[in-house]
Amino acid sequence: MKFFLDTANVEKIKEFNALGLVDGVTTNPSLIKKEGRDFYEVIKEICSIVDGPVSAEVIALDAEGMVKEARELVKIAENVVVKIPMTKEGMKAVNTLSNEGIKTNVTLIFSANQALLAAKAGASYVSPFVGRLDDVGQDGMFLISEVMQVFGAYGIETEVIVASVRHPIHVLESAKMGADIATIPFDVLDKLFNHPLTDNGIAKFLADWEAHTNR
């Protein structure tokens, strides 16, 4: 499974990319706003750091506006993927962009039907949101299992990006279900490194070594 970093924080992207853990990056207007920088500058810098796909989202709500923005976004770098919302106008834009060879990531997906529609429209990626479904009392990971089942049944090549990841269990369950990608906030990715028994083991080894060398 590929790991994307769900952030627009350039320093964090550099940090995890240096570990060989970043296969791509996803951004959205909220993440860009947190950085307080020019949108195009941030995307351009991220694309210079990461070789893999970098999702940049359109703001327009109509298909014509989305297509116009998308054509400008892909001029930033070859690895830009245009993020499009899951709406009827969005799917119209995805179909147009797909025919032009522009890669798209359909975001804000909350049902398998939406994922299927996006794939049929020509999306390169779909992003089902698991955490937000959990927030309203639904089972976010069940959505991933449904999407993987449908895509597998028909050999659909659209890649599934598990989004709205809130904790390490989401990452593990995504991997077990065979999801192509999980896009992970850096604070959650940090947690994947940790286990109390690892810390205890290191402390024990160091204590034993110190006792051995001080004999």
Swiss-Prot record:
GO terms for cellular component: cytoplasm. It comes from the Archaea. Transmembrane segments: none annotated. It catalyses: D-sedoheptulose 7-phosphate + D-glyceraldehyde 3-phosphate = D-erythrose 4-phosphate + beta-D-fructose 6-phosphate. It is found in: Cytoplasm. The active site is at K83 (schiff-base intermediate with substrate). Coiled coil: none annotated. One of its GO terms (biological process) is pentose-phosphate shunt. InterPro entries: Aldolase_TIM, TAL/FSA, Transaldolase_3B, Transaldolase_3B/F6P_aldolase, Transaldolase_AS, TSA/FSA_arc/bac. Its main location: cytoplasm. Disulfide bonds: none annotated. Its EC number is 2.2.1.2. Keywords: Cytoplasm, Pentose shunt, Schiff base, Transferase. One of its GO terms (molecular function) is transaldolase activity. Pathway: Carbohydrate degradation; pentose phosphate pathway; D-glyceraldehyde 3-phosphate and beta-D-fructose 6-phosphate from D-ribose 5-phosphate and D-xylulose 5-phosphate (non-oxidative stage): step 2/3. Transaldolase is important for the balance of metabolites in the pentose-phosphate pathway. HAMAP family: Transaldolase_3b. Belongs to the transaldolase family. Type 3B subfamily. This is Probable transaldolase. It comes from Methanococcus maripaludis (strain C5 / ATCC BAA-1333).
